[in-house]
Amino acid sequence: LKISRGGSKKNDPRKSSEKVSMIIEAKAPTRVDLAGSTLDIWPLYLFHPGAATVNVAISRYAYCTIETHARGDERIDLVSRDIKRKESFASFAAMERAARYKLPLLAEIAKFFRPAGGFTLTTDSEAPAGAGIGGSSAMAVAICAALDRFTGAGKSKEDWIHISRDAEAIVINVPTGTQDHYPPAFGGAAAIELPPGGEHRVELRVDLNELEKRLVVCYTGKPRQHGINNWEVFKAHIDGKGRVRHGLERISQVAQQLRGALEGADWKSAGALMREEWSFRKRNLPTISTRMIDRAIAGARRNGALAGKVCGAGGGGCVVLLIDPDARERVERAIGEAGAEVLPIKIDRQGVQVVSR
């Protein structure tokens, strides 16, 4: 799927007697989280004043295409290319009545927007399975953008973020946060501040070209249980486990300090803070790491990486490394020798894009 800027937000197949078919395409970037994740899950951030997450949108994309059916054809087809799964319903009402779904994220978001008329909704993803780079969240934001264009709902990006968060919680049956959804919606590098009353995004005052030179992302394999690590930390915190609460407090403080180091282009301090964040995260939940993750980070560190940490809930998936730009070739070779796969990435500057024709 290829998207370029263009299209009109006024196209609505439900209101046009001339258009019987429309194609809407949306794409949204994934992200790497540099510090502070897990804290974005309500109400954890309320217990840690000043809590924030720091993340960067990257050029591994999730895609959503909607193709409307001819007038009178009420059938709804949901298709996922990346996991090779599809399902169909005779109508929207039939989809609402279904007891379970093969593609629950697609169905739950479609149910929120309540589109009129039949359509085929197709998704695809460049994120490897269980990568921990927010692939499902990017997918959800892309679906929201496409369905918003299709229905003329006129929702904001912040609305898409909260619809996506809630749909994911319904699907995985555990609490979810919002830090995974802001990079797909807005792109760039940002701090997601988490005060009482609701989160908000603040763009980092950082040279994105310079930061881009200093990031490496690698994939260490699919985790055994997606999303469970965050739930275990969440539950331990709510249950009053002092060690976990203290660990998240330090992670919160480190995230605030890392934001300052990045904005000051103090890369040495940024590396030290990322190492500290990763250390506290492993203490909170040792299963967040694996032997391959440890090997990849250790090998990269010996060859010029300043720091490395797992992305997302961990237990496998991706690792993000902060490096000296001159050491890139050595770091990438060390990652390969550890058995991991380097994923070429750039920083996405635009966030979700949607076009229709």
Q: Can you annotate each of these PLM segments?
A:
Residues 115-122:
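Conserved catalytic cysteine-centered active-site region
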